[in-house]
Amino acid sequence: MKKLSTNQIRKIWLDFFISKNHYFLETVSLIPVDDPSLLWINSGVATLKPYFDGRKTPPSPRLTNSQKAIRTNDIENVGVTARHHTMFEMLGNFSIGDYFKKEAIELAWELLTDKKYFDIDKNKLYITVFNEDTEAYNIWKDVIKIDEDHIFRLSRKTNFWDVGQGPCGPNTEIFYDRGEIWDPNKIGPRLISDDIENDRYIEVWNIVFSQFNNDGNNNYVELPRKNIDTGAGLERFASIFQNTPTNFETDIFYPTIKKVEQLTNNQFKYSIDNYFNPNKKQTRINTAFKVIADHIRATVFAISDGVFPGNKDRGYIIRRLIRRSCVFGKELGIKQAFLYKLVDSVIESMKEFYPYLIDKKTLVEQTIKDEEEKFLKTLSKGYDLLENIIKTKNTVSDKDALLLFESYGFPIEQTIEISELSNVTVDVEGFKKLLEQTKQATRNARKDLKAWDKQNELFTKLKVESEFTGWSETSRDNAKVIYMFTDQKQVESITNQEVFVILDKTPFYAEKGGQAADSGIIFNDQMKGFVIDVQQGPTHQNIHRIKVQGTLKVNDLINCRVDEEKRIYTMKNHSGTHMIHYALREVLGTSVMQSGSYNDENGLRMDFTYHRLPTNQELLKAQNLVLEKIKNKIDRQTYFCSLEESVKKHQALAFFTEKYDQIVRVIKFGDFSSELCGGTHVNNTSEIEDFIITGIESKGSGLYRIKCLTSFRAVNEYLNEQFKVYKDQAESIIDKYNQNKDLLKNDQLENIYLQIKNTTINKDNLLVIKNLLDQSKEVNKDYDKKVNDLITANKLLKYKDLTPSLNKDNINEIRLETTDLNIKDLKQLADDLRNKYNDLIVILLSSTNENTFIVVAVSQSLQNKYKAIDIFNNLEGYETKGGGNANLAQGKFVKK
């Protein structure tokens, strides 16, 4: 058999399908786009769902890709099994309404067995099919000529792909026989037929024949358009072609494992031979190496795609991977942060197909290092907690084990091993049940979100062509109505209702790429319609949601008028988004990556990833860079070209969270901003007019949202509003100060107020006045305390001559009832009296117009016999409500 590297395997796969007229889809981000049902891209087909359900038209009915994916539903198995990973790469070929079973099987067989490609021995391949899928069985037997003893007809459990609702169908799987050396019990093909986990017969390819729609109640209807969805794990192929015991000895992971060995000062070694001659201690060591090698790869890719360690969702998964790796690193004697030193190894092995990782190296290293160092402190607390549990209990409970697992990153194996050293047991079964409940809660939180949309016949058949003309115009006469529908029903005529309309040509922009949809009107002699919304259809038609007054019919000619003012201000903001993206990358570095945006006529916001919150000075610098480009009056340039040309020739920023067509549109401003974009933009930067950053907020670990405004009108309105808010706050502070300045004067507070009052309204002074106001609040906080202390002191002056008298127990006691003291005053008076007299009990009551207050205090010297809380609770003649301790009790009272 050929010995192939991972890069060679991937290339042979993609080149083969490209030669068979498949369109190559670039790998996309691990972060799903417009799919709340998924936390991660978890398969090769997950990125293609809109093509399969008909919401979008694919660039070709034949597709191929190599897609990175993450699955973490059983993360605890990583490092234990031979082929389980958090991140994996799935090779795929897909047919959307083109070829079906026969050609899919023939293509797979040719790639696997032809000497020009993988050249695998045909006799080493075994096949499974769904037991009711006679068609697939006969293709393998009669067309491919597979021996019948190499074909297994299995149940729905293993050979029918169904997620409960939407496209589904039978599948066929291809297995490679690695030989008897991997089958120590000599079970043979029954390992396949009985679906027994094994290392002899490796599943290399799964081909799903998507031919039914499940309505959600297990009623199956033939799809109007049948599809092929296949997946083949690259890591498994690598293990086969490199003849390794597990995936971890392949060129994907083994260089990282060798690097970890160096970081242990070679005190610990990974043993390949341990597979055949297992040793419990070495198996545990191997597991540690595997976990680290697997988790660091997933972490590098996730952070590069914009996921940062955090406390929820994707961020929590990455935090958990880092923490789990740290724990296993400690098992290998590594006590310092070390994972960040492995980033280079991961990038080196993956950069040929993922060159963008190179630019992310510094960001990824710094992010991992920061997270490691924070966790190492937590980890030591985890060890302390476990040691305390072991000292005080005979068993580590299920709840304690889960706490150690989730909050401190302790794998259950780690807890068991440490506990066993002290002959303490762990409630493993209880832990597993609690862990499953936690997982189920996560699943339930997402279960109502459909994993696959039911294939919509209306959209799959929606082939009418429509041209968007709005890049160069905002009005059009004699546009033709070519399609109308309502409630998923096609209509020919509509009167005084809302309807969805497609025109042959339209100037109305459909919401996409972060830009809001246009609004406006359409009209002719028979009707007037208000365009409420515009969304894009599966083949790029702009679908207008229109409230019709009068009657509108298919084939009518209408006049279109876009709301020009809304469009103009939206254009300013969209171009402003490109400007601030450029400026942030210029100020903070190219590790800044846009992860979403929205712009309409009212402003813009942009989400971006970065390892920390930018400083005010950095934001001001970015703002000034944008203003400089506006002042320089730079023309916009627009190009239509291939994705490859857009990057190579125009240095356009292409975002891995987006999917692009074969021909893309590049928007350039000078030599500083070049992005793929389908939106509307100003012709010259001067048309943006003005620019200001109005705020920034964290949207999660490593993700920030910046908000901005453009145009003279919007910026001036914002400045006037903000200055009024700040000056009103300053006015409120000084008004309160003026009420008390006869009691205590503060020149600093008065001076700051005058500076705020006299500050001129402009962008440069916005930060100045904000800082002055913050300074004023700090000074006022200190001033208020001093004034309140003075007021209290003055109120307490008339009680300075209080003296104790002996109570019935011959103990010094001061009892006072008054009407002018609040609870704070009473506590201060009690402290003053205890400081003045020794061995004293103080009982103070005050009845104001609004409330009653009581404070009881006891000198420390008496607290062995008299406790403030006891006196408080048993005060003769009063019902008290409150709390306290031996020293002091406080609350409210009612006379009996």
From Swiss-Prot:
Database matches in Gene3D superfamilies: 2.40.30.130, 3.10.310.40, Bira Bifunctional Protein, Domain 2, Threonyl-trna Synthetase, Chain A, domain 2
Residues annotated for Zn(2+) binding in this entry: 574, 578, 677, 681
Cofactor, free-text remark: Binds 1 zinc ion per subunit.
EC number from the UniProt entry: 6.1.1.7
One Pfam family cited in the UniProt record for this chain: tRNA-synt_2c
Keyword Manganese in record: no
Enzyme class: ligase
Protein keywords: Aminoacyl-tRNA synthetase, ATP-binding, Cytoplasm, Ligase, Metal-binding, Nucleotide-binding, Protein biosynthesis, RNA-binding, tRNA-binding, Zinc
Broad class of where this protein is predominantly found: cytoplasm
GO molecular function terms attached to this record: alanine-tRNA ligase activity; aminoacyl-tRNA deacylase activity; ATP binding; tRNA binding; zinc ion binding
Catalytic activity reported: tRNA(Ala) + L-alanine + ATP = L-alanyl-tRNA(Ala) + AMP + diphosphate
Known function: Catalyzes the attachment of alanine to tRNA(Ala) in a two-step reaction: alanine is first activated by ATP to form Ala-AMP and then transferred to the acceptor end of tRNA(Ala). Also edits incorrectly charged Ser-tRNA(Ala) and Gly-tRNA(Ala) via its editing domain.
HAMAP family xref list: Ala_tRNA_synth_B (MF_00036_B)
UniProt remark on domains: Consists of three domains; the N-terminal catalytic domain, the editing domain and the C-terminal C-Ala domain. The editing domain removes incorrectly charged amino acids, while the C-Ala domain, along with tRNA(Ala), serves as a bridge to cooperatively bring together the editing and aminoacylation centers thus stimulating deacylation of misacylated tRNAs.
Family according to the record: Belongs to the class-II aminoacyl-tRNA synthetase family.
Protein known as: Alanine--tRNA ligase
Organism name: Mycoplasma mycoides subsp. mycoides SC (strain CCUG 32753 / NCTC 10114 / PG1)
